[in-house]
A protein has these predicted regions:
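Bacterial N-terminal signal peptides
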Residues: 1-7
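N-terminal leader/linker segments that initiate helical-solenoid repeat arrays
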Residues: 8-55, 59
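Structural signature of tandem alpha-helical TPR/SEL1-like repeats
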Residues: 17-26, 52-63, 84-97, 119-131, ...
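Terminal, low-structured helical/coil segments at or just beyond the last alpha-helical repeat
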Residues: 18-23, 182, 186-218
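Structural marker of alpha-solenoid helical repeat scaffolds
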Residues: 33, 67, 101, 135, ...
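Helix-start (N-cap) detector for alpha-helical repeat units in TPR-like alpha-solenoids
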Residues: 38-39, 72-73, 106-107, 140-141, ...
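Position-specific recognition of the canonical hydrophobic site in helix A of tetratricopeptide repeat
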Residues: 49, 76-83, 117, 144, ...
């Protein structure tokens, strides 16, 4: 089932809008003939998502879940569709159910954290981001997700720590270095910001890409 999640995610954008519409039309006819075929419904929902037909996708995932309440693909992507429609309570419910079944799914945890942020639940989102770091201590993205939220909340000291941890795990990611430099510039710590940029250049980032931030260090 998790392989299906990867397959669906990777196939996004592989077809044109017209091809997706043709696929959905064909699948509608197949579903009419085989209404209990969950694979057909998942494939149609994928087409609906790629056409941004969120309500239709949610309807298909509902059919799937009525037959298989623990279908991970349906839960995960229905949560995504609910998020697109700003149905945050329903998105949260689907992510919670998904994570009860598959508690160590990185993208689902990030999806839940995003929903909690949209709902304005500051304490819960920080708890979720802390959990993500605990579950995935080797993931640069885990630290970066927490750092981004801390930066937004102006929790600069802890954000700097998390950006450092993200950089340590993925030193080639220039966005992490720039994010750290942005905080240092906001704190008027220009020398440290420049050192952060210099370190990124030493790791292989072309200096020209960082000109905007170097100029602000003067």
């Amino acid at each position: 089932m998790l392989a299906m999640l990867v397959m669906l995610a990777e196939s996004s954008g592989a077809q044109t809008s017209q091809q997706w519409r043709d696929s959905v039309s064909t699948l509608n006819e197949l579903i009419r003939q085989n209404p209990k075929d969950t694979d057909l419904r998942l494939r149609k929902a994928e087409g609906n998502i790629n056409l941004q037909q969120w309500d239709y996708a949610i309807e298909e995932y509902g059919h799937v879940l009525r037959q298989d309440e623990k279908n991970l693909a349906a839960l995960y992507f229905r949560a995504y569709c609910h998020t697109q429609l700003r149905h945050y309570d329903m998105a949260k419910a689907d992510y919670d159910t998904f994570l009860t079944i598959q508690p160590q799914h990185f993208e689902a945890h990030l999806g839940l954290a995003h929903v909690l942020q949209k709902m304005g639940r500051k304490a819960e989102i920080l708890d979720e981001l802390n959990l993500i770091v605990q579950l995935f201590p080797d993931s640069a993205d885990a630290y970066a997700a927490r750092a981004a939220y801390e930066t937004e909340q102006k929790l600069y000291d802890v954000a700097l720590y998390d950006w450092d941890e993200a950089i340590r795990r993925h030193p080639e990611n220039v966005e992490y270095a720039v994010s750290k430099a942005e905080i240092l510039l906001a704190l008027e710590r220009k020398k440290e910001a420049r050192e952060t940029l210099d370190a990124a250049v030493e790791r292989g980032t072309p200096r020209g890409l960082l000109k905007e931030w170097y100029d602000r260090c003067k």
